[in-house]
């Protein structure tokens, strides 16, 4: 008898058995579950919501940057490798740690904490005041409002995941609100912010310590990349030694002034297109700020530094790498220096209010940055110059350099607006104390947008006190916004060029507003 025929059934059965155990055996190459707080490198595989993703850019995972919503960081590669039937998620996230408070006023407090971890992913956090849920957030920060002056509250935070599992409460944090009488600003409740040139452009050469005492916040301009395409920023004083410049900063700070490092400018293109450049950015800024003792950082990116890639259509979840990396980098710098570190930004109108009608390229490109940093942002002073005309919330176009322009552009940030048209996602308003008006100090300072002191002050009287000047634009909030912070100008040097006419006109005006408005936010 043929031996091959005799043993064929045995061989067939053995082969079938081998195929069965291979099919049902656990896969050795199954991807690990994605977790917030984990450092991933390019090529790492993870599973999230039963789908597999490959890391395409090294980063540390954060809540809100899950693989399914950040294609700039993750590439979908197939259905989940964890098995045919996923195991139900019953494990709660870890307990939030490091709960701290900052920016305590008589009616509000800012809270922050360390990110929790979870076997699948943290979906968000719940904030409790005296044991009662007061707000939920997808980030590790929250602002609790509606508090009473001179009152002590106990705050806790719980983490939750997509399956509904909730962690135990964090360690309780006791916070006592202020009595409302503290001095909030460097010298008053209304600030005058100016940019100081670290270069000579024919305006005026001023030692930093000799800046007019009218200014509350001085933005030293600029830190710039060491070379084209680099993420490493550098700063060297142009008219003083390092020791002299550090002494000048300390001198201004002894007078109650805040001295910030401004990065970028018209010539300082900063494009953080990958994780390496982002790390260079973080490391170099931390070094510069620590060396000189700056009080904070100002973001003054223009041109191609911020531009939306094709297909990046929602400011709430950006996909353009240089925008994603900028957000992560600035958050890291802010976190490194703590709650008292000031963060400001000076975008052009096209990059902010321009997103009202169109979102793409430069139009609205700052909105994802402002949105992601709104809890960290001390002040936003959009440049109301070099812009031409812009459309307000009423659908009408207003020309730069007029009172109507300033009122219309400011109220867009105070009311919020739909992005990219009336059906687009809504950009929520900022707090009034986060807003200042940016204008040129003289006609020589900008290509357009200079506003006379009389026109700027009547715009501010309307915006802050609701005192109408009979213009074409009508405030949606007729009583105004008392908390608006003040005026920013380009620049201190151009102001000095005209014998400080700008600051001499506006400092007394701001002082007058300071005596009429109270209960501002403390920084």
Curated annotation (Swiss-Prot):
In the record, biological process GO terms are: chitin catabolic process; polysaccharide catabolic process
Question: How is activity regulated here?
Answer: Activity is inhibited by Cu(2+) and Co(2+), and almost completely inhibited by SDS.
Q: Which enzyme type, at the first EC level? A: hydrolase
Molecular-function annotations in GO: carbohydrate binding; chitin binding; hydrolase activity, hydrolyzing O-glycosyl compounds
Q: Where is the Fibronectin type-III domain?
A: 95-180
The record's listing under Gene3D superfamilies reads: Carbohydrate-binding module superfamily 5/12 (2.10.10.20), Glycosidases (3.20.20.80), Immunoglobulins (2.60.40.10)
Write the Enzyme Commission number(s) for this entry.
3.2.1.14
What does the record note about activity as a function of pH? Optimum pH is 4.5. Has an extremely wide pH stability range (4.0-13.0).
Report the superkingdom from the record.
Bacteria
Q: How is it used?
A: Has a potential application in agriculture field as a biocontrol agent.
Q: Where is the GH18 domain?
A: 190-513
Q: What GO CC annotations are associated with the protein?
A: extracellular region
Keyword Transcription carried by entry: no
Please state the span of the N-terminal signal peptide per the UniProt entry: 1-30
Positions of the catalytic residues: 302 (proton donor)
Q: Which InterPro entries match?
A: CBM5/12, CBM_sf_5/12, Chitinase_II/V-like_cat, FN3_dom, FN3_sf, Glyco_hydro18_cat, Glyco_hydro_18_chit_AS, Glycoside_hydrolase_SF
**Which chain regions cross the lipid bilayer?**
none
* Annotated family: Belongs to the glycosyl hydrolase 18 family. Chitinase class II subfamily.
Explain the purpose of this protein: Acidic chitinase that displays a broad substrate specificity, showing the highest specific activity toward colloidal chitin, followed by ethylene glycol chitin and ball milled chitin, but exhibits no activity toward powdery chitin and chitosan. Hydrolyzes colloidal chitin and chitooligosaccharides with degree of polymerization 2-5 to release mainly N-acetyl chitobiose. Displays inhibition effects on the growth of some phytopathogenic fungi, including Alternaria alstroemeriae, Botrytis cinerea, Rhizoctonia solani, Sclerotinia sclerotiorum and Valsa mali.
Task: Give the protein's recorded name.
Answer: Chitinase Chi52
Its source organism is Paenibacillus xylanexedens
Taxonomy, top ranks, is: Bacteria, Bacillati, Bacillota, Bacilli, Bacillales
